[in-house]
């Protein structure tokens, strides 16, 4: 049996991109988004990347030659904002999946650094080990103390391997449940950040009961006597997402996706290969707008122009505002009434799909 890690450890900004210790005001949506490296640009973003490169070249030329190109640069930036808006207003389901997987997209630890104060990380499930794919701990959003549960994919190669690319083992889900029960005991609301390609289906994971661990979480979260807010911040795939996805509010970031299976997995089953993943993405109705129309989710959290990967600070501010508002609403509801509402909410899943045109 693996050695159990310590139960409590101070959070440290080790792997995530550093966040400024001074809270910065988010850039307005009409401001020019931060340029994306050509190596990081998504296939459909290439016209945007090309225009960004031209703007940067003109800025360099202006500095080198001492010629005033400010009018031309301003005009190109205006065109850039229009191009980004047009592109992101017309994303296909498959393009949305690509945005959700962008390597620069904020992950759980990034949001912890940006919006959670006094975060104290809690480790281990007291049965097997400490799964790095799920981060748990206490902290504050505004003046409200919370229990944070979040899935972490990792940034660099070392962290990705440690986090198993966001694919949690059963000990990760048991760790999450243990911390949720701790939260309920001490009257702390639970905030779950979902971002996973799925629970890990390996031999060891199956031997240790990953399906049972997820099922127990579904059962226990359904009746946990404390407010629960669940937010899909990136990928929300299958039971791996459901394992921390039952609550009183279920929201999605604008360019996240949430589905019973990944587009590639669906394509492999229906078309015997991954080539039809774009068709599968459309059929799965996995985008935030589709799922809100179907009644699966409650809210969509708007992302900054060009997606969260272009302006993580603005995305974090939008997420923080949503959590604070939801906490105020849920904290005002007596626990027995809250549990009745949660039960009715769960019973309504799928009804929107039956009544949709």
How would you name each of these model-derived features?
Residues 85, 89, 118, 122, ...:
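Glycine-rich beta-alpha loop segments
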Residues 69-72, 172-174, 266:
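Short, motif-level signal for alpha-helix interfacial/capping segments enriched in acidic residues
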Residues 51, 92, 148, 195, ...:
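Terminal peptide-recognition signature
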Residues 106-108, 156-158, 200-202:
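Short active-site-adjacent helix-start/loop capping segments
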Residues 2-145, 313-357:
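Intrinsically disordered, low-complexity segments enriched in small/flexible residues
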Residues 98, 138-140, 145-149, 191-193, ...:
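Structured core elements
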Residues 26, 194-324, 328, 332:
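Conserved catalytic cores of soluble enzyme domains
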């Amino acid at each position: 049996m693996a050695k159990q890690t310590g139960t409590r450890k101070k959070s440290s900004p080790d792997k995530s991109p550093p966040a400024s210790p001074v809270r910065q005001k988010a850039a307005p949506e009409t401001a020019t988004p931060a340029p994306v490296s050509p190596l990081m640009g998504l296939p459909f973003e290439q016209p945007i990347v090309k225009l960004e490169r031209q703007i940067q070249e003109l800025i360099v030329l202006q500095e080198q030659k001492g010629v005033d190109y400010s009018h031309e640069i301003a005009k190109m930036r205006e065109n850039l904002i229009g191009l980004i808006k047009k592109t992101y207003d017309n994303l296909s389901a498959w393009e949305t999946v690509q945005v959700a997987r962008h390597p620069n997209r904020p992950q759980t630890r990034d949001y912890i650094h940006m919006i959670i104060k006094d975060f104290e990380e809690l480790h281990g499930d007291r049965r097997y080990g400490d799964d790095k794919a799920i981060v748990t701990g206490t902290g504050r959003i505004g003046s409200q103390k919370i229990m944070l549960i979040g899935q972490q994919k990792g940034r660099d190669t070392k962290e990705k391997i440690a986090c198993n690319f966001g694919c949690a083992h059963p000990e990760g889900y048991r760790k999450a449940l243990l911390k949720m029960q701790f939260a309920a005991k001490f009257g702390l609301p639970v905030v779950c950040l979902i971002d996973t390609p799925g629970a890990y289906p390996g031999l060891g994971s199956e031997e240790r009961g990953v399906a049972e661990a997820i099922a127990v979480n579904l059962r226990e979260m359904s009746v946990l006597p404390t407010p629960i807010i669940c937010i899909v911040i990136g990928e929300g795939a299958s039971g791996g997402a459901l394992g921390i996805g039952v609550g009183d509010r279920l929201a999605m970031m604008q360019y996240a996706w949430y589905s019973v299976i990944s587009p590639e997995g669906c394509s492999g089953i229906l078309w015997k290969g991954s080539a039809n993943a774009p068709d599968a993405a459309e059929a799965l109705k996995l985008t935030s707008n589709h799922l809100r129309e179907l009644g699966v989710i409650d809210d969509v959290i708007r992302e900054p122009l060009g997606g969260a990967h272009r302006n993580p600070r603005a995305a974090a501010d939008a997420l923080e505002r949503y959590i604070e508002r939801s906490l105020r609403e849920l904290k005002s509801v007596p626990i027995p009434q809250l549990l009745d509402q949660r039960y009715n909410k769960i019973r309504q899943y799928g009804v929107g799909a039956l009544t949709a045109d």
